């Protein structure tokens, strides 16, 4: 039986050759297809352009671990495909590991075969932590029809935290312009992201 580890132990024991998450006390490697990486990079680059052009006080990265809690209180170490972080928070302790316990501004998860993690587990954990905006990018339309409808088509879900701390969601498909609270001037079209 493998001994369960804490988030702090995860930061120390996490291998440096690749990307890993702490899931239910175990270190789990994240392996992505090239298409998955292309979609995440396109979104990250689009956010970076907004930050630079509008002089916004954010940092965008794909290398940050975030401490979350499950409903049962189990520590997780999540690593969103794209993280948008308040620059002051990011720079508050620059010698620390690239890990945060505080809520970030925006998390993006690009779905893969373990899509239920993004639609169920991470959705709950990110809401519980208080992440203001969360995107689930189902560029292949692989989630259950319960989530993306029937017929199943590629969809981007944007979850926004409301005043009561609950996510409200909007789905974007095809030629829909993605509406973002964090980046109100963003002009991304859903199919642009899906067809990278």
Where are these regions (language model features)?
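Gly/Pro/Ser/Thr-rich low-complexity, intrinsically disordered segments predominantly at protein N-termini
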Residues: 1-196
């Amino acid at each position: 039986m493998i001994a369960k580890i804490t988030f702090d132990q995860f930061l120390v024991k996490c291998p440096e050759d690749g990307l890993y998450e702490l899931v239910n006390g175990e270190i789990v490697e994240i392996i992505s297809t090239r298409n998955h990486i292309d979609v995440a990079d396109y979104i990250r680059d689009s956010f970076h352009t907004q930050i630079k052009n509008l002089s916004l006080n954010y940092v965008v990265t794909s290398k940050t671990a975030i401490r979350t809690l499950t409903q049962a209180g189990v520590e997780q170490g999540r690593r969103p495909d794209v993280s948008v972080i308040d620059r002051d928070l990011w720079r508050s302790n620059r010698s620390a590991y690239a890990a945060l316990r505080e809520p970030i501004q925006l998390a993006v998860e690009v779905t893969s075969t373990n899509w239920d993690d993004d639609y169920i587990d991470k959705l709950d954990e990110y809401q519980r932590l208080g992440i203001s905006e969360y995107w689930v990018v189902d560029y292949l339309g692989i989630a259950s029809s319960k989530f993306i409808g029937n017929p199943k088509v590629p969809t981007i879900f944007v979850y926004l935290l409301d005043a009561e701390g609950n996510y409200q969601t909007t789905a974007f498909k095809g030629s829909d312009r993605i509406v973002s609270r964090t980046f109100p001037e963003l002009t991304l079209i859903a199919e642009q992201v899906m067809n990278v």
